[in-house]
Amino acid sequence: KPIAARCQETSEGIRNKDALVLQATSTLPLSYEEINPITCLDEVFHAHATEDINYGVMSSGLRDLSAKADTVVVEGSGGWRVLMNDLRPYAEWVVQEQLPVVLVVGIKLGCVSHALLTAQSIINDGLPLLGWVANRINPGLAHYAETIAALQQRIPAPLLGEIPYLPRAEQRELAHYLDISTLL
């Protein structure tokens, strides 16, 4: 997670909950800074944020991690076209690094349009869309199965798995919900 908003000050420094989960579940012993080199205390990065978005730091960190591991998974930050404080989209860095993409779709009202636009944007940016994951964030969503079917028919990449609605999902083992055999 090279960049994270909604961080909190802790006794160990500024930390992000998702990055801490990634650090704890990494197959390699990595420092927090290797997992999350750029942090922001605000809800989002914005034009007036004091944190500097340095793509060089992100790229250097990616190279360092790639030298240590067979596979590096880079978690996104806020969506494909989210703007960083220098008003460049996060996707610009992903394109610069030519990273393949797995799209995570929060299954909720309006997600079909958002997911299809995001998938098309990733493809238009010239990156491979390796697959997508359905993340059920609303347990009461009507027509859940129909929504998944509509996305499967329209996203030009395989469904890698469905994460059911789970309270405290970050505290649970989720790997068994995914089939990443097509990615290996």
Label the model's feature ranges.
Residues R88-V95, S113-N124:
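Histidine-anchored nucleotide/phosphate-binding helix
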Residues A119-L184:
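C-terminal lobe/tail of nucleotide-utilizing enzymes
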Residues K1-D52:
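N-terminal phosphate/diphosphate-binding loop that engages ATP/GTP or pyrophosphate donors
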Residues S26, E97, R154-P156:
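Short, structured coil segments at secondary-structure junctions
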Residues K1, V102-V105, L130-R136:
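Short internal beta-strands
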Residues D42-M84:
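Phosphate-binding/switch loop-helix module in NTP-utilizing enzymes
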Residues N85-K108:
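Inter-motif core of Ras-like GTPase G domains
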